[in-house]
Amino acid sequence: MRRREMAGCGHPLPFAAAAGLALGLALFAHQLLLTLAAVVIGPLPAVQTALYLSRKDLSENAVQAVSESAQETQAEPAQEAPALPAGGIEAYLVPLEGDEARPEGAGAILEKNYPQGSGEKYIPCGSGSIKNNTSVSNTDVAAEITNPLPFAVEWNSPDPQILIMHTHATEDYRLSAGLWYRPGDGSRTTDRDLNMCAVGRVMADTLNAAGLNTLHDETLNDYPSYTGSYANSRAVVQQYLSQYPSIKIVLDVHRDAIETENGSRMAPVCTVNGRQAAQVMIICGCDNSTTVSLPNYRLNLRFAAAWETAMEGLYPGFTRPVLFSYRFYNQDLTPGSLLIEIGGHGNNLNEALYAGQLAAQGLISALKQ
């Protein structure tokens, strides 16, 4: 699939051209270092991210030099490309396979809208709910989520406020329009236009367009080995936080995988503004004083409740109950660290892309409160 690219700057004038040539040579040399590093030490996610961040700084500094040179020659300033394509979600959607491509022995997809919970395990959260799988009392949880967010983002800031990343970046979705999937489909791909990176891209673009400076890391933390992916993603996040201490929110974007005993895959779905979307579910970890060390879990819980309230209030039926459980997921790194499941492996990619946009719009609403 063709990658989307930002609009270019037009033809540079002589001084800018010289600076541009210098940029090209510098980036070529840096890419050569990247290749040599990959040969010597292998595709370690933390190393990849360090090189990516270094290359990003080099590019930004060189682009600034080109810009300053162009200004000296009174070049016409290039128009800044919008963060979100003018076509909205349509600009991101991909062609899906029709039933003529359905293979023999295809597996079944079952669509279901998962409702908000009720009963002793569930705590109301605006129009949504929180499923409490911990020993923290419901009364305590209900009181905690009435507190304000533990951080304040800066709107239209030059400094990053949000980081989106993917511990299991290679998770993907079905590419069929019909309710079937291919036999042997492992629901994984390294193609960033088809896996979790594509969903994260929509979310980051939506947030940036609203004035929330958001970074999106596309490191494949679960490739080539699934084992150790959370250690890999932790190193990645720590590098970003070291380089950009302004970051308040870290979102680990995944998809779920719900399957019946006979192999049918579940697709959590809802309809928003006439278009089918995947349902989403926030997971917030809790400290248990032994195996899960999250002493500031209450801060993340407040954030989870605010986001859940905003999303379900805007789009009834869009969210599944927040899962509050003894999970770690590196949620000790910021007071705004959460994991969100965008649909499941039974959803098609377009449902997930749309859900990513809706989840980001819900986050914008929550942060404006």
Residue positions per predicted region:
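Active-site-adjacent substrate-binding region
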Residues: 296-323
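Structural recognition of the beta-strand scaffold that forms the well-ordered cores
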Residues: 163-166, 214-216, 249-252, 281-284, ...
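A short, glycine/acidic-enriched catalytic loop
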Residues: 182-186, 258-293
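N-terminal Lys/Arg-rich, disordered targeting/topogenic segments
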Residues: 1-11
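Active-site-adjacent mobile loop/cap segments within catalytic or ligand-binding domains
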Residues: 319-369
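Solvent-exposed loop/turn segments at secondary-structure junctions
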Residues: 169-172, 220-224, 255-260, 287-290, ...
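Alpha-helical scaffolding within the catalytic cores
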Residues: 237, 262-270, 322-328
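N-terminal catalytic or cofactor-binding beta/alpha core of small enzyme domains
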Residues: 17-248, 257-262, 357, 365-369
